[in-house]
């Protein structure tokens, strides 16, 4: 019980409380552009601006604090295969003070189920959820060479991850290396020997873009499903790599007393061409089923950051933003137009003609009759899972799943006839 002599201000400092509303959004795997607060805001801005017929500005996070004083020489970035690593950016930040994060960062992380650790780790997590770009920080003083290599090893190696577990690397694992010493499983999990600790004063901050297939293979092989791998597996925006790094660095300068002492290193071998699609206005009407005014179509496309080129009476050339990996065809563009226009605005005839075909599969008919007869006699039907645990499988030639969800469902269940024949 607090003394009555304590003022209200002190009580508020002791009992800090706030209310919040958390929205959980179920995303399909193809909507990698919306796996961030900024990405969701971008979509909401488009829908609300169109449906409310008013312009809403989308405000990007501030990087006004970003500035560097070049003291330290840059590290060399060596990417062995541009398919595996399309872009790699980095900064060296000095005078870091490891401490608790400010309340606004801790509150944001707690709200989305992430436990705050320290200001550096928290800022990388904060920016990842804010912008959708995973980041990783290394202790610069533990990097012994002047070259960061992004490569796969041809020979097996041992690697200790942040959780203290020693893992066997395969030749499919893409690694971030201190010359030839592995520091991190790229896009998935960091290493213990180069991690940030309470004694860290200088960090190398990484922002990169990795091949989704490569990341998924390693993630499933090592059973490491992280927030970082979740995003890389679905595809991360190449154009956002540098901005996210600057955003994190600006927060580190502001809240960790950091000082950037290098150039922004940017190795970009995997540049991609713009996607251009021709949109036929007649096809919009045919596919949707009713006519949408051309001015409304253009408004929707502009709100979605689709650049409109070469407009004629019957068609328009569309340039798709790089962060929209799911839009590759004309029908995808039409789907986006309808999504923002509103599925609820689809005009439906009042009369619906529904035809139900008669039952023609006689096998099912007799099976149902027999089932009804047997159940009336007190029999019970058993529908077994087609998967069982390895211990329960009595067959010597058991078929084992390579990546089962559980040890209890790791083998295919043989029928009694198949088991007898084998």
Predicted regions and their residues:
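RNA/tRNA-interacting regions in translation and RNA-turnover enzymes
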Residues: 3-363, 368-370
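Polar, glycine-rich mid-to-C-terminal structural blocks
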Residues: 354-359, 366-416
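Hydrophobic pocket-lining residues within nucleotide cofactor-binding pockets
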Residues: 98, 210, 387, 418-419
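Single conserved hydrophobic/aromatic residue that forms the stacking wall/gate
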Residues: 1-10, 414-422
